[in-house]
């Protein structure tokens, strides 16, 4: 990360757009949830991304949700490959727990601070997934996942649906913008 030059041009605009997607309230809510589950007291004087960057807090979070799912945590890691190993172990444990792959962040999103908002969205996805596991009794993070509401119709109900008169569907004859011209007409030959 130290040899990466500061972004300029289009990269700078992309970085600013990604930073604009961050929500400090959600980040604080995620940190409170982590503290409640792990029992850790996180250093809130640090930046959100710096608290999570080495991956140890995330690994401890996953082990508190599903004990023993991450066997090796590289504590106090300073070497980049050890830090990335922690983050990768966390992501693999989340996949195994049932978090959809589409909701996971990439290792570089956290390690190189590329997309911190995606890291927060991943934590909220983990919170939603926890609520689907009956053995989970911890605090809630984010909304509950929707459950399937399958409908069963009898053959008679399906036949009755075919008897609906087309006039009951509604009308497609109403106000439209056909024929409306705004401003002066364009004259090709004046």
From Swiss-Prot:
CDD domains: CH_dMP20-like (cd21207). Pfam families: Calponin, CH. Calponin-like repeats lie at residues 165-189. GO terms for cellular component: actin cytoskeleton. One of its GO terms (molecular function) is actin filament binding. Residues 1-23 are annotated as: Disordered. Muscle specific. PROSITE patterns: CALPONIN_1 (PS01052), CALPONIN_2 (PS51122), CH (PS50021). GO terms for biological process: actin filament organization. Residues 24-130 form the Calponin-homology (CH) domain. PANTHER family: CALPONIN (PTHR47385), MUSCLE-SPECIFIC PROTEIN 20 (PTHR47385:SF24). Belongs to the calponin family. This is Myophilin.
């Amino acid at each position: 990360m130290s040899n990466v030059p500061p972004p300029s041009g289009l990269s700078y605009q992309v970085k600013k757009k990604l930073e604009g997607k961050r929500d400090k309230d959600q980040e604080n809510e995620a940190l409170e949830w982590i503290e409640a589950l792990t029992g850790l007291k996180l250093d809130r004087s640090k930046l959100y991304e710096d608290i999570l960057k080495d991956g140890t807090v995330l690994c401890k979070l996953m082990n508190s949700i599903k004990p023993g799912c991450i066997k090796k945590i590289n504590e106090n890691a300073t070497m980049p490959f050890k830090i990335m190993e922690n983050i990768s172990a966390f992501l693999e444990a989340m996949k195994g727990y049932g978090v959809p792959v589409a909701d996971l962040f990439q290792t570089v999103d956290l390690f190189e601070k590329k997309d911190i908002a995606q890291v927060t969205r991943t934590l909220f996805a983990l919170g939603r997934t926890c609520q689907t596991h009956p053995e989970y009794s911890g605090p809630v993070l984010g909304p509950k996942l929707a459950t399937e509401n399958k409908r069963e119709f009898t053959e008679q109900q399906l036949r009755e649906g075919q008897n609906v008169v087309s006039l009951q569907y509604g009308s497609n004859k109403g106000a439209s913008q056909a024929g409306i011209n705004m401003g002066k007409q364009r004259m090709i030959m004046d």
